Every structure is written in structure tokens, then in C-alpha cells.
From Swiss-Prot:
Organism: Adiantum capillus-veneris (Maidenhair fern)
GO CC entries: chloroplast; small ribosomal subunit
SUPFAM superfamilies: Glucocorticoid receptor-like (DNA-binding domain) (SSF57716)
Keywords attached to this entry: Chloroplast, Plastid, Ribonucleoprotein, Ribosomal protein, RNA-binding, rRNA-binding
Keyword Cytoplasm: no
Protein name according to UniProt: Small ribosomal subunit protein uS14c
Amino acid sequence: MAKKSLIEKENSKKKLVKKYNLLRQFLRREIKNSLRIQDKLIISEKLQSLPRNSARVRLRNRCSLTGRPRSNYRDFGFSRHVLREMAHTCVLPGVLKSSW
């Protein structure tokens, strides 16, 4: 189980990413479409003035139950430990244990 403070920090980052996502996309598009270098510099300064944690790169995928940061399956949102336990208890529909 991950520390609650780390899980809360990740949740606050998600909120910031959601809040500034459209503005970041707009500024990136403006940089790409502008022709003058001075305009690009001004727009890039505006982009740099946004909070660091509002960048999607700074997010970390975590297990939705335990908060484990590593070995997560995107399709389910769980870590490998939780996914295995849920598959064995038949909680996840359509997930079967492989055998050959």
C-alpha cells in the first residue's frame, strides 16, 4: 500500500493536468503555427509560466486500489498483484487463467 500523501499528490497533479490541458494544447499549437521567432519566444515563455505539475508527463500510473506505482495494467487500472487476486476470485468478467 502506497503512502496516502503520495496518492493525494498524484490526484492533485491529475486535477492540474485537467485544468490546464486546453491552454497547453492551445499554446503548443500557436508555437507550431507562428512564423516569427519573437512570437514563438513569447508564447513559449507563457507555456513555461504554467505550473510544472500541469504537464501530463509528470503523471504516474498508479493502482486504483493500492496506489502501487509500478507494474500497472492500463486496461484495468490495477497492479499485477491486485489483478491476479481479482482474476482468481472471478471478480473481473472475461478474464481467464491461461493454460496450455
